[in-house]
Structures are given as structure tokens and as C-alpha cells.
Design a protein with these regions (language model features):
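Oxidoreductase and adenylate-handling cofactor-binding alpha/beta cores
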Residues: 89-108, 158-163, 289-302, 337-341, ...
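An N-terminal-biased, well-structured beta-alpha scaffold segment characteristic
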Residues: 1-81, 195, 215, 238-240, ...
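Hydrophobic Val/Ile/Leu positions in short beta-strands of Rossmann-like dinucleotide-binding domains
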Residues: 6-8, 144, 324
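Hydrophobic/small residue at the entry helix of a nucleotide-binding pocket
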Residues: 150
Length: 392
């Protein structure tokens, strides 16, 4: 009999699914799910049943998942940062090249003269050659806003291509900053970065502080010959202001992976249909990483790369493992251990980690526990979820 069940939405690479099945987990959309695995599916609250312990996004963005609701129910939400970073980076580099050489404008102009007589066609080709003179990217400056997995890879590639790189990331960790190439020049503000850049590439997550972050203020600093690249999230750019700058030719190109119908006819917009992570390698990497997360979480309660829970690992030293999700308030651990002591349950080892208002505990016990113990724990004010994960 299968121990846990995983429900999938979207097409998930078989490499990730096989990893899940290999350890005895089932993948059945008709059964109650203990874990949900998805890509771009917009998950509704109604689809999250009481049996769900974790939701796993095979990709980086999690704005298609109701995270606040999940947190309130003690449900961990995971993503796979970095698994598709190389795929997105390659499309960004391609976009820098095609925009600097006017590739699409030149191609579209060729289509218009295809029916001309041969001699006239050759003349027009030479005229187009003069019309679409491009620029080389060597020696040009790219400003990168957001220096996470993707932004740092873009920076490395641009440096290797001879570009000057300016970076800005107000929330970068010390550890991540140490990993950045030393050639990156740090901007003191996004305004300074925009003013100095020939290309501006956005690599930020979407949240309340980044929505419309590229606003009228930043657009007012942009060079009319600059190229703005958005491979992060559509809502990061204020499209009302963008529309004005595009139609008044105050921006050379806007290149994006998030097409808008109103911009498709503009010759200074290059749109792709969400191709950033759409490579077989990226999809496989995301599925494999998600599979590994599901296995560790369902079988051992361990967490890595969660957006709402702290990374928490504890080497299993007992067949009787308990996990507890609670509000991050004083004396919660004391109340948990008091209940276990009341029932004569000894703690072999444990770890307690917190993230914001939430705390997560893994406890290895010296003996098994019954429903009476679990009910006593879940009835503690401030505890949102309790799981008993025996390994017998």
C-alpha cells in the first residue's frame, strides 16, 4: 500500500515522477493528495484539501499559489530556485544580441520585399542593410536589477562577452554577494543604474514591494536608445507608463517573456510566449529537484527551498519522527515538550527553526505515539499542523 500520494498539475518531466515513484510514493490525481506538484497551474484554495502537507512548484515563481493561506494552514510551499536559471540566462543573452542588431525589424522588412523583381530586390536589400545598422555589445553597459541565481548568471555571461555590468539588489544576502563576479559595479540606487545603462535586465521575484517597481520614476531616467529586458514577472513593469514610452519612441526596445496583446503590433517590442524556462533540460532539472524535495519532506519532514518555511534538516536517528508547525511565539517548544512528557514520550533529538511569524520543529522520539498524543498537541493554541512520520 502506498504511504503518501502526490497530485500533479501540468506536464511534469518523467524524471521527477520516476524519482517519486521509486521510493514507494504514488502519483494519483483521483486520490486525496498529501503533496501537490505543479508548474504554472493557478492553484485555488478549493483545490488544497486537508490532507495536503506541502505544495511543490517545479520552477522559481510561486505567485500562482495562495501562500498566505497555505502558511495559515501549516502547509509548506516549495520552489526550485536555480533549476531553470541557465535556460532563462541563455534567452536573456539572445535577447541582448537580437535587440542590438535589430534582427526582427530587419527580418520583417525583408518579408515585405520578397515579391519584388530580382534586381530591385537586391537594391532594397542593400538599403535595408543601411537602415538596420546595429551596435556591438562589447563595451556596452548592462544594468541588472536582482542578482539572484539568474541575475548572477546573466552578469557572468555579459562580462565574458566584454560588457560592463552594473548591479543593484537591495536584499542580496552576504553569502550571495560573495559569489558575484568582482567585475560587477554596485549601483547605489536603481535610478543610478538606469541612467548609466544601455541594457537593463530585470530579475526580481513578484511581491508587494516589487509590483510596478519599474515605474514612472525609473522610466524618466532611461536613455531613449536603451533596451529594457523583463524575464522576471510581467507585473514588475508599470505597463501604463511603458506604453507611453514605447509609442513615443523613448525606448529602443522592450524585450519580454510576458506578451501583452496591446504591444504585439509595436516594432520596438519583442515578446516571447513564456519561453524562458521552456527547455527540456530546465523542465527536467525542476522536476528532479521537486521530486527530491517531496521525498525528503513527506518521508522525513525535512525542508529545503521553501518560500514560507525555514530550511530544516535533522538526520533521522529514530523510527518515530514528529513534526510540528506553530506560531513563532515564546514557550511553544516548552508546551510541545510538556505534552510529550505527560505521556511518557522521551525526545531523542530535535531541531526548532523559525521564519518570520512561523516556526517548524522536527522531533525524533524514543517511542511511538498515538492519536491521543497528536490531538493533545494540535489543541495547543498556536499550533497549526502536526505530523507523525513513523519509519517502521
Amino acid at each position: 500500500m502506498d504511504k503518501f500520494n502526490v497530485k500533479t498539475y501540468n506536464s511534469i518531466s518523467h524524471l521527477g515522477l520516476e524519482k517519486i515513484k521509486h521510493v514507494g510514493l504514488s502519483i494519483d490525481s483521483d486520490k486525496n493528495a498529501n503533496a501537490i506538484l505543479l508548474r504554472s497551474h493557478k492553484l485555488s484554495i478549493d483545490e488544497i484539501k486537508e490532507s495536503v502537507h506541502g505544495i511543490f512548484r517545479a520552477g522559481a515563481g510561486t505567485n500562482n499559489i495562495p501562500i498566505d493561506y497555505c502558511t495559515s494552514k501549516g502547509i509548506a510551499v516549495f520552489n526550485t530556485p536555480g533549476a531553470n536559471a541557465n535556460a532563462v540566462k541563455e534567452l536573456v543573452i539572445l535577447s541582448i544580441l537580437i535587440s542590438s542588431r535589430n534582427i526582427f525589424r530587419a527580418k520583417n522588412s525583408l518579408l515585405k520585399i520578397g515579391d519584388l523583381p530580382t534586381d530591385q530586390f537586391k537594391v532594397e536589400v542593400e538599403n535595408l542593410k543601411k537602415e538596420f545598422v546595429g551596435t556591438e555589445i562589447k563595451g556596452r553597459t548592462i544594468g541588472i536589477i536582482g542578482l539572484g541565481k539568474i541575475g548572477s548568471l546573466v552578469a557572468e555571461s555579459c562580462i565574458s562577452l566584454g560588457m560592463n555590468v552594473i548591479g543593484y539588489d537591495p536584499v542580496i544576502s552576504v553569502e550571495s554577494a560573495w559569489k558575484l563576479p568582482s567585475a560587477i559595479v554596485r549601483a547605489s540606487s536603481p535610478e543610478q543604474l538606469v541612467e548609466l545603462s544601455d541594457f537593463i535586465s530585470l530579475h526580481l521575484p513578484l511581491n508587494s514591494s516589487t509590483k510596478n517597481i519599474f515605474n514612472a520614476n525609473l522610466f524618466s531616467k532611461i536613455n531613449k536608445d536603451a533596451v529594457l529586458l523583463n524575464f522576471a514577472r510581467q507585473e514588475i513593469v508599470d505597463e501604463k507608463v511603458l506604453d507611453t514610452y514605447l509609442k513615443s519612441k523613448k525606448l529602443k526596445y522592450y524585450v519580454t517573456d510576458f506578451p501583452s496583446p496591446e504591444f504585439l503590433s509595436l516594432d520596438n517590442v519583442i515578446s516571447f510566449p513564456h519561453l524562458g524556462a521552456s527547455t527540456s533540460s530546465a523542465e527536467e532539472n525542476c522536476a528532479i529537484m521537486s521530486g527530491e524535495q517531496i521525498i525528503k519532506f513527506l518521508l522525513d519532514g525535512e525542508i529545503f527551498n521553501s518560500v514560507n518555511f525555514p530550511d530544516t534538516t535533522l538526520k533521522r536517528e529514530s523510527s518515530y519522527r514528529l513534526t510540528v508547525v506553530n506560531k513563532n511565539t515564546p514557550n511553544m517548544v516548552g508546551q510541545i515538550t510538556s505534552v510529550l512528557a505527560k505521556y511518557g514520550i522521551n525526545i531523542h533529538n530535535m531541531i526548532n527553526k523559525s521564519k518570520g511569524d512561523l516556526a517548524y520543529n522536527i522531533l525524533d522520539l524514543d517511542s511511538s505515539i498515538n492519536d491521543q498524543v497528536l490531538n493533545s498537541l494540535i489543541n495547543i493554541n498556536g499550533i497549526t499542523k502536526v505530523r507523525y512520520i513513523p519509519n517502521e
